[in-house]
Amino acid sequence: MARILIVDDDAAFRDSLAEMLQDLGYTVLQAETTDAGLHRLRTEDVDAAIVDLRLPGEDGLVFLRRAARISPVPCIMLTAYASGGNTIEAMSLGAFDHLTKPVTRAALIETLERALRRAANTPDNPQAAGASPAAKEPVDGTELVSSSEAMRQVFKRIGLAANSDATALILGETGTGKELVARALHRNSGRATGPFVAVNCAAIPAELMESELFGHVKGAFTGAITERTGRFREADGGTLFLDEIGDMPLATQAKILRVLQEREITPVGANRAQPVNVRIIVATHRDLPSAVKEGRFREDLWYRLQVVPLWLPPLRERLGDVLLLAEHFLRLLGGDSPKRLSAAAA
């Protein structure tokens, strides 16, 4: 059975977590400081680590940086709050995912199992997970095309975030390519062979939103003559992209928050929750902090979503890409004899 390292200075919490893992059959190693945890990582076989971000002396971020040079084990970070700057930095440093204290048994099992599966499928070369998205870009209209410095920073964050299962939040005006970035995150992740399911939350009537996302059982409501799978289960094993989440009704936002916390859904009309194995990526063109202040968006969901934020600059701020994009679309749509821009047009 897998060997799990817990690094946390709270002895009572550490023992409770260790007992939970031992009940599941795992071998547990414990440490209360970054130095002690790194020592165990150097001297013992470890398959995954669960590390508190807030540790005495050198914190969990230091552990992440140094652990990456010792062993490519997936690290699950523990946070006392739904999100924050340290959580974002941890994901950028390569943390596999994060859990918010108090940790539920269901969330722990689901996250740890994903981490161990990822570790089993990760090549020995640690650079493989951080390869440039361009290396896997298709030529089918869904690739990212840019030479601007602003977009190079986006590409870098895609490379850092792709191999994590953390929720990603893509921000940008309409037309900046938010779905293309979501597809790049999926394509460069360990879920690339799984489905990518995109949902435009702004296009679904409020009364149909829950059935669309979570599915329903036969007879759940008038007109439900058959069972519906729902988008979450359609995306099982892959990525669910919720576009324009800023337009989602408050009632549905509460259920999305529960999915992020528990990794399970309850179809409309069902009596029992069902586990789901999906990475959630969301996007919006709206100002979510303002929506939170106005009561149109849940503050707790907002904090849960901004673990890995990516902001996309509009084309007017990267004018050097205009010619590049024009030539790209001419090649894409030109068939066997694509046209080229004349010198005058360029």
Per-range role (PLM):
Residues 33, 59-62:
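Acidic catalytic/metal-coordinating carboxylates
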Residues 44-50, 55:
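Active-site beta3 strand of CheY-like receiver
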Residues 107-173:
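Flexible nucleotide-interacting loop at or near the entrance of a catalytic core
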